[in-house]
Curated annotation (Swiss-Prot):
It comes from Kosmotoga olearia (strain ATCC BAA-1733 / DSM 21960 / TBF 19.5.1). Transmembrane segments: none annotated. GO terms for biological process: translation. This protein binds to 23S rRNA in the presence of protein L20. Keywords: Ribonucleoprotein, Ribosomal protein, RNA-binding, rRNA-binding. Pfam families: Ribosomal_L21p (PF00829). Part of the 50S ribosomal subunit. Contacts protein L20. The gene is rplU. PANTHER family: 50S RIBOSOMAL PROTEIN L21 (PTHR21349), LARGE RIBOSOMAL SUBUNIT PROTEIN BL21M (PTHR21349:SF0). One of its GO terms (molecular function) is structural constituent of ribosome. One of its GO terms (cellular component) is ribonucleoprotein complex. This is Large ribosomal subunit protein bL21. Belongs to the bacterial ribosomal protein bL21 family. InterPro entries: bL21-like, bL21-like_sf, Ribosomal_bL21, Ribosomal_bL21_CS. NCBIfam families: L21.
Length: 104
């Protein structure tokens, strides 16, 4: 059984027991329980259920394992022959969520 959820403006495929990396969930601390109620699709033994746009009475329950920052990317701005270059770095915040159960 799996579900497609919407979280932080993105769509994720989730199953019970997997670890999901989302954009940082600011309102939740490590160890807090998270409920995703924006479920777009649910596939189980009886078939596929598609929401319009979301399914009612379906929740995904998870637990925030940790918050962290991703790998550093470097953005380079460069002008040839002008001795001009700028380098910026960026590390995106993320939240690691363990999916505990799918309730429907």
């Amino acid at each position: 059984m799996y579900a497609i959820i919407e979280a932080s403006g993105k769509q994720y495929k989730v199953e019970e027991g997997i670890t999901l990396f989302t954009e940082k969930l600011k309102d939740f601390a490590e160890g807090d329980q998270v409920v995703f109620d924006r479920v777009l699709l649910l596939k189980d033994d009886s078939g596929v259920k598609v929401g319009k746009p979301y399914l009612e009475n379906v929740k995904i329950v998870g637990k925030v394992v940790r918050h962290g920052r991703g790998k550093k990317i470097r953005v380079v701005k460069f002008r040839p022959r002008k001795n001009y270059h700028r380098v910026k770095g960026h590390k995106q915040w993320f939240s690691e969520v363990l999916i505990e159960k799918i309730e429907y």
